[in-house]
From Swiss-Prot:
Sequence ranges assigned to domain Thioredoxin in this UniProt record: 27-132
Main location: endoplasmic reticulum
Disulfide pairings: 56-59
Organism: Bos taurus
Assembly behavior: Interacts with ATP2A2.
Name recorded for this polypeptide: Thioredoxin-related transmembrane protein 1
């Protein structure tokens, strides 16, 4: 009989654990987990989102209040969620998380930052009394769905990827710290060179440069070889014509001189004949 009595206690403990496990699991499911893959669900409906880190003392103190508030989510028709910034660095950049914990209220894609007391009662009053209407929403330029915040998210993800690679080089491959920095420096130079070449190629294709042709110096046009003999003949004919005209002009000048001399002689001879007759 003693052994049967001793078996009752472990069986009772086992039944208690089996009954309590689903209850505890259902309680944890009241707070939804938001990641980079499903964050766009926040754009529909009403949400309260907490950004936290496991190592943050203030975040640890907030967790019981947040879990209790999540139990009222169905009655208040609000979704209660949380984001672990250590596992989702892209979301921390997308929402510009500069302090922990940070709480956002979202209503149909409009985000407002909650800065009130962090108790269950205050959270419930904030939703039931619609106190969020008195808070100015985040500008569309800095909204999580904007191009600027998407770029910021990509930058945060890149920084986390670089950190992971750095740890892999040091811990798994055994490289020294300066060796890891050297790898990143070479990768940065190579990526910058490739990016610069790509940008130059795109700029040259979109806006080609207008190359100015040099103006030719003034020069005489050279005739083809086939026309050179004809040109020589024309030049010789022009030279002959010029010689003939010069000879004609010289002969005319000589004739004029002779005519003038004869006229002078006749005038001088005339008076002398008259004196002889007298």
């Amino acid at each position: 009989m003693a052994p049967s009595g001793s078996l009752r206690i472990p069986v009772a403990v086992l039944l208690l654990l089996l009954w309590g496990a689903p209850w505890a699991h259902g309680k944890r499911s009241d707070v939804r987990i938001i990641t980079d893959e499903n964050w766009r669900e926040l754009l529909e409906g009403e949400w309260m989102i907490e950004f936290y880190a496991p190592w943050c003392p203030a975040c640890q103190n907030l967790q019981p209040e947040w879990e209790s508030f999540a139990e009222w989510g169905e009655d208040l028709e609000v979704n209660v969620a949380k984001v672990d910034v250590t596992e989702q660095p892209g979301l921390s950049g997308r929402f510009i998380i500069t302090a922990l914990p940070t709480i956002y209220h979202c209503k149909d894609g409009e985000f407002r930052r909650y800065q009130g007391p962090r108790t269950k009662k205050d959270f419930i009053n904030f939703i039931s009394d619609k106190e969020w209407k008195s808070i100015e929403p985040v500008s569309s330029w800095f909204g999580p769905g904007s191009i600027l915040m998407s770029s910021m998210s990509a930058l945060f993800q890149l920084s986390m990827w670089i950190r992971t690679c750095h740890n892999y080089f040091i811990e798994d491959l055994g490289l020294p710290i300066w060796g890891s920095y050297t790898v990143f420096a070479l990768a940065t130079l190579l990526s910058g060179l490739l990016l610069g070449l790509f940008m130059i190629f795109v700029a040259d294709c979109l806006c080609p440069s207008k190359r100015r042709r040099p103006q030719p110096y003034p020069s005489r046009k050279l005739l083809p070889e086939s026309s050179q003999p004809l040109k020589k003949v024309e030049e010789e004919q022009e030279a002959d014509v010029e010689d003939v005209s010069e000879e004609e002009s010289e002969s005319k000048e000589g004739a004029n001189k002779d005519f003038a001399q004869n006229a002078v002689r006749q005038r001088s001879v005339g008076p002398s004949l008259a004196t002889d007759k007298s």
